[in-house]
């Protein structure tokens, strides 16, 4: 069941079809331009922007030692009302740049994962790649609630997306 986050803020993220991945933690050792996956071809028109716009507070509040990122590939099935419901059929931890060996239980901060969307309205390419912000909590096994505002397509139609993942899910 989807629940509304009580304290998390909304994050404004631009949809991208470049296959780009970027951790927005300032302490992440691989957060430079080389921190990306290979480009993935998509059909139809998608957002021309390749920028990720982190919330201003993220960079300021990302503290502690070097952050590491776990690259995930989770399937998301679109539902009515502009929401996504998580149906992760599999998770793959792909080859990652040096310093990106997975999220440690002691790490904190916000990380971006790349997710492939499915079941969107026709105006959004079903193959579009989107970057999702994930808040990792020290002591938690992996993921918890995140909220984001997703901008897709040439018109950057905004959708409010709420999803809930936790360590008990298949993701």
Swiss-Prot record:
Residues 27-53, 82-108 are annotated as: Disordered. It comes from the Eukaryota. Residues 32-50 have a biased composition (Polar residues). This is Putative uncharacterized protein LOC100128554.
